[in-house]
């Protein structure tokens, strides 16, 4: 597999609308199958592999540019990072912003995939997984203290990024977003996690 792509937490005024519109486009839905097959059903940001509950995101951030070479496979944890302003809308995404400069966003998402499977399937390391995840969740308090009340809510931060003048957004990205990570919420991803966990358990049993 080629090197993983980096994730920059982001929010825009129109990308979410375009991302959702194409989900009802039968031609695009067929086209995304080609993207998943090319990428071997593997998230290009965290290396998580699954047959179901995958998404397709646009590399250049332009959701009008739907050329095959501009589309890559992403899991739900990584996908939501590109649409901060829309997290929590309906059934889309869920999580909190935490202070975690020692891990990249992709590394944190990959770790959460492992932790959630351990917690759901009741592996021997379940308690350790639960404690580690809890310790990450507590880091949202640092964000609230250092950057402002409510800013551990990704949708709120996303709306702030959309509304900020362009030059201020670049400054904020340099000062804050390089140290912030989006921690996926286990409850909001319950359906996907349970499905992935069953698949992982089946693979262990029959491998």
What do the PLM-derived regions correspond to, one by one?
Residues 1-16, 81-207:
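Extended charged
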């Amino acid at each position: 597999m080629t090197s993983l792509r980096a994730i920059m937490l982001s929010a825009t005024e129109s990308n979410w609308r375009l991302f959702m519109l194409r989900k009802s486009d039968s031609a695009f839905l067929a086209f995304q199958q080609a993207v998943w097959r090319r990428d071997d059903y593997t998230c290009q940001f965290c290396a998580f592999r699954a047959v179901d509950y995958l998404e397709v995101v646009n590399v250049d951030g332009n959701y009008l540019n739907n050329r095959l070479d501009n589309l890559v496979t992403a899991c739900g944890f990584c996908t939501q990072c590109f649409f901060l302003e829309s997290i929590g809308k309906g059934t889309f995404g869920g999580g909190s912003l935490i202070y975690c400069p020692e891990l990249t966003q992709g590394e944190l998402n990959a770790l959460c995939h492992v932790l959630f499977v351990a917690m759901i399937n009741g592996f021997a390391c379940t308690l350790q997984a639960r404690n580690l995840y809890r310790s990450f969740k507590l880091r949202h308090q640092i964000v609230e203290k250092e950057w402002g009340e409510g800013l551990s809510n990704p949708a709120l931060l996303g709306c702030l990024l959309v509304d900020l003048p362009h030059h201020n957004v670049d400054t904020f990205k340099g000062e804050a977003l390089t140290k912030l990570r989006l921690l996926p919420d286990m409850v909001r991803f319950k359906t996907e996690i349970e499905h992935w966990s069953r698949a992982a358990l089946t693979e262990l049993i029959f491998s």
